[in-house]
């Protein structure tokens, strides 16, 4: 009977670890997918509109084509780069997780530190892009900055979608950091 009990314990201990391993892989796959989508959505974000410019009251308005592009604002460039870095890291860590399968604890420590770095990186990129996006949406009357989303609606909507998708990636990386901490806390 003693041998049967020890086998049951082994199975019970191994099952949560296997579930966590699958959860880890799925979160890494999710982080990879959504950061890739966010980077692609912002990289193709561009809109051209004819904007009437009034030079003088005595002249009719002059329609000038203006183009809104993601690379015209440094916050959007930073946002794209952070998502590209996080996407690349997610792909590499997913491959390492598949190859390693818990063999090297030193590697998992490094991955945990880099996961934490990705959380900070993505949230900072999301915050920067969201701040500029809100300025574009509402403007700032105190410094006489006009809103632009009423003119470049598609551009702003696509940027907002990219930020929302990237936030899902941020949360996936956050869960990759929190789940092992909770698991470690339960063991002690």
Swiss-Prot record:
The chain crosses the membrane at residues 24-44, 79-99, 117-137, 162-182. GO terms for cellular component: plasma membrane. Keywords: Cell membrane, Membrane, Transmembrane, Transmembrane helix. It is found in: Cell membrane. Its main location: membrane. Residues 45-78, 138-161 are extracellular. Residues 1-23, 100-116, 183-188 are cytoplasmic. It is a multi-pass membrane protein. It comes from the Eukaryota. Belongs to the Casparian strip membrane proteins (CASP) family. Homodimer and heterodimers. This is CASP-like protein 1E1.
């Amino acid at each position: 009977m003693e041998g049967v009990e020890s086998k049951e314990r082994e199975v019970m201990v191994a099952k949560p670890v296997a579930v966590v391993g699958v959860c880890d892989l799925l979160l890494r796959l999710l982080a990879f997918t959504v950061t890739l989508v966010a980077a692609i959505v912002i990289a193709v974000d561009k809109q051209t509109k004819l904007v009437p410019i009034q030079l003088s009251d005595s002249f009719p308005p002059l329609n000038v084509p203006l183009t809104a592009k993601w690379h015209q604002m440094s916050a959007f460039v930073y946002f794209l780069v952070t998502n590209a870095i996080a996407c690349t890291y997610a792909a590499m860590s997913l491959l390492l997780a598949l190859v390693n399968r818990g063999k090297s604890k030193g590697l998992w420590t490094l991955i945990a530190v880099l996961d934490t770095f990705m959380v900070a990186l993505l949230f900072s990129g999301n915050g920067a892009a969201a701040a500029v996006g809100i300025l574009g949406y509402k403007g700032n009357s105190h410094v006489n900055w006009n809103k632009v989303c009423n003119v470049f609606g598609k551009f702003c909507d696509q940027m907002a979608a990219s930020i929302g998708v990237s936030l899902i990636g941020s949360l996936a990386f956050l869960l990759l950091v929190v789940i092992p901490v909770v698991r470690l806390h339960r063991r002690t």
